[in-house]
């Protein structure tokens, strides 16, 4: 996992399956409508500034790595409040015209949801973007891309 550390800095969704925790989530996203136009980072990291993006990405990523290495992963992963807030911000960011002009739901923030002043996007759109899958065992035969080599391409070129 450390040899593939560089993959975490980019936006390639295959970096999210360096450990098996995200395999079912990757597989169900890959076969869903969002896979055509979005990456994991489009929904799961903040986009308001680059510092917040990489701080959040590093913190969240280390949490996933820690849980994987210490075998503490849950059967069904749920976003913690901080992650849920980012996900909701990104739903509204990408679907701004639809949310604010057509159905008038985009004015609700995740804090409003926490105060019972509205619903989160996924309260109605439960199957977006990962389908009906809700646990690690619900997609036991999930196929995901595996890297050809754990050695990054730039290092392979230096060694040759």
Where are these regions (language model features)?
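Short sequence/structural segments immediately N-terminal
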Residues: 1-160
